[in-house]
């Protein structure tokens, strides 16, 4: 019986990341060995464009495959509506989906939109999305820093 090995899907979203700031895209001034290693074992987009130059709409587009106005996230500090599905909600159940980092599409503290593994890093955005009783919860990153 052949075992089908599914590929890992890893998306890395960075802020203020221009094409000319990564070594694998030809920059010879900035060393990015970890990103170069990922590029060597994967693929590099050579003709990619963002749908919007600000964080939340761009993230919504990449996670949902929809234009910002269709995903109903036309600006920052707009929560991704529950009826808009992300890639984590569209892949089969045998994938474990995790999100680590800055979400900017809703509450930063609690798992949502199909992601079951969740490490939030932005406490300041709770004010935009959390109910007041949830403001007592702090991000995993906050707890990590306190433990240091």
Locate each region found by the language model.
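Formylglycine-dependent sulfatase
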Residues: 1-148
């Amino acid at each position: 019986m052949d075992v089908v090995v599914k590929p890992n899907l890893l998306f890395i979203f960075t802020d203020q990341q221009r094409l000319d700031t990564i070594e694998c895209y030809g920059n010879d001034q900035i060393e990015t060995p970890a990103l170069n290693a990922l590029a060597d074992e994967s693929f590099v987009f050579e003709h990619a464009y963002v749908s919007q130059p600000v964080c939340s709409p761009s993230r919504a587009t990449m996670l949902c495959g929809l234009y910002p106005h269709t995903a109903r996230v036309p600006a920052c500090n707009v929560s991704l509506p529950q009826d808009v599905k992300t890639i984590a909600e569209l892949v089969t159940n045998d994938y474990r989906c995790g999100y680590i980092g800055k979400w900017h599409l809703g509450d930063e503290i609690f798992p949502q939109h199909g992601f079951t593994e969740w490490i939030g890093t932005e406490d300041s955005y709770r004010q935009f999305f959390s109910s007041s009783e949830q403001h007592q919860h702090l991000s995993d990153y906050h707890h990590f820093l306190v433990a240091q």
